Curated annotation (Swiss-Prot):
Gene3D superfamilies: Ribosomal protein L28/L24. This is Large ribosomal subunit protein bL28. Belongs to the bacterial ribosomal protein bL28 family. The keyword Phosphoprotein does not apply. Residues 1-25 are annotated as: Disordered. InterPro entries: Ribosomal_bL28, Ribosomal_bL28/bL31-like_sf, Ribosomal_bL28_bact-type, Ribosomal_bL28_sf.
């Protein structure tokens, strides 16, 4: 399963670890992904999404129905 937020599209980014001596080694910064079940009243079922806390705030603001419509418009299966 890929480490991508289904709502915001946030993915891992790359950067450097920096030691005290300023040595740089490559590393990945992973998004804070959470698996969360949402009740969809229109479909009378739960939908599990893998998303970041920002994605959860977007769902709080817009509603799960609107966010699911946007995800399905992108072609993702939910």
């Amino acid at each position: 399963m890929s480490r991508v937020c289904q709502v915001t599209g946030k993915r891992p980014t790359v950067g450097n670890n920096r030691s005290h001596a300023k040595n740089a080694t490559r590393r990945r910064f992973l998004p804070n992904l959470q698996s969360h079940r949402f009740w969809v009243e229109g479909e009378k079922r739960f939908v599990t999404l893998r998303l970041t806390p920002k994605g959860m705030r977007i769902i709080d603001k817009l509603g799960i129905e609107a966010v699911l419509a946007d995800i399905r418009a992108r072609g993702e299966k939910v």
